[in-house]
Amino acid sequence: MLAIRIERIGELAVVECKGRVVRSEAAFKLREAVTSLRNARIIVLDLSEVGAIEGGGLGMLLYLQRWAYGHKIQFKLFNPTRSVRDRLELVNPIAQLDIATVHEMMELLANAEHRYSLAA
């Protein structure tokens, strides 16, 4: 089972995932969550609490990457667990999935908060 929570800060959306992405239902749930964020400029998928990801989930990440690119949205993965990172490394040379570093994530959050406070 996959639980998803979305945090918005201005044009930044952080999609926090918890559980496993091993069945079609989980992959489709992830797709619905991410594609609902059409007005975001940056989408970060937090994988720190995802215990496993299988073929359908990996395929969905590739789909979401292409979807985001087509909508001029930056799509980044953040903090995948060791088991998820191992699976990602199998497809990453081909897919070029963007995995944000902690420093990059802190910078994204700081910039989003700054822009959000200026808009308020």
What kind of region is each of these model predictions?
Residues 1-51, 63-120:
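STAS-like cytosolic regulatory interaction modules
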Residues 54:
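ABC-family nucleotide-binding domains
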